[in-house]
Each structure stands twice: as C-alpha cells, then as structure tokens.
C-alpha cells in the first residue's frame, strides 16, 4: 500500500473515532487510534485540509472535533 493510501486509511480511522466518540483532546484521540505516530498526524492533516475537522488550542491542550 502506498503512502497516500495509508494516509487515507489513517484519516478514515480518525474520522470514525471522532464520529463515534465526539470531539476530544488530541492526546486522547492519539491513544484511541492505535496507528504509527507519523501516519496519525498525516491523517489529521488530511482531514484538516479537507475541512472535516476543527482544531482548537487552549494553552497546551489541543481539541479535535468534526465539523458538522
């Protein structure tokens, strides 16, 4: 599987987890989605570029949620 396909799969896994559990802190999402760190962040980037997630920062905390 090439890197673009792996990134798409990672993005799908992240989207599904957010759809089921709702918005959450980045650290918790990372713990729930058990994939390689670089693929996780590539998946986050993919979803952000497509406008499917919202990323908000509060101090050191980063919250990720789906855009409805």
Residue ranges and their predicted role:
Residues 2-11, 25, 55-68:
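Short, cationic-aromatic polyanion-contact patches
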Residues 29, 41, 58-59:
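Short loop/turn and capping residues at structural boundaries
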Residues 35-46:
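Short amphipathic alpha-helical interaction segments
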Residues 51:
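Glycine-centered, phosphate/nucleic-acid-interacting loop/turn motifs that mediate DNA/RNA or nucleotide
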């Amino acid at each position: 599987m090439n890197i673009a396909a792996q990134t798409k799969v990672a993005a799908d896994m992240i989207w599904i987890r957010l759809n089921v559990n709702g918005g959450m802190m980045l650290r918790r999402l990372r713990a729930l989605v058990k994939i390689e760190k670089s693929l996780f962040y590539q998946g986050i980037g993919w979803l952000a570029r497509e406008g499917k997630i919202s990323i908000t920062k509060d101090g050191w905390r980063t919250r990720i949620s789906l855009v409805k």
